Amino acid sequence: QRLSARGTLFGLGQAGVPDSLGPQDRDRIERWLETAENLPLLEDYVLAETETDREITIGATTLRCRMDAVFQRLDGSGWLIVDWKTGRRQVPVDQLSVYVHAWAASQGVPTGSVRAAYVYVDYPGGRVNELTAEGLLSIEQIQAALTVG
């Protein structure tokens, strides 16, 4: 296990890595964890929750979200949801809008205080695709997408 400068503990056990995993796979996961703990994105944040579930009802549909990691700003002023990606296939970042709305509702905070990003740990140094304020889908937009799809 390692303790980063930001106080976030990352270790193979916490990542759910079984003891039976081979050395090559363990090395790859260690690289991913090292990438994660050195991300500039996480500066000024501390890990609050991992593999946490939230639900949000939009229209007649209840969506269940499992968030890989949620970090809180050190000063308590905001949140950062991270969805770790171990592959390189890019996922549309606007899908994180559901996570932002679900987390904000569960904490009783405005969506403007919640950031969200996909972090692709298989790239050297990591690749971050963050949902921007302009890219955040409204509840109405999500509801419209649910009724179309």
Q: What do the PLM-derived regions correspond to, one by one?
A:
Residues 50-52, 103-149:
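Metal-dependent nuclease catalytic regions and adjoining charged, substrate-binding loops involved
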Residues 6-15, 78-80, 119-127:
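Short acidic (Asp/Glu) and glycine-rich catalytic loops that position anionic groups and cofactors
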Residues 53-98, 104-106:
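Non-catalytic protein-protein interaction segments used by genome-maintenance enzymes to assemble
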Residues 18-29, 93, 136-143:
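Generic detection of long, well-ordered alpha-helical segments
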Residues 2, 95-99, 141, 145:
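Alpha-helical scaffold elements adjacent to nucleotide-binding pockets in ATP/GTP-utilizing enzyme cores
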Residues 1-3, 63, 79, 115-117:
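Generic alpha-helical hydrophobic packing signal
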Residues 1-56:
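A non-catalytic, helix-rich entry segment at domain boundaries
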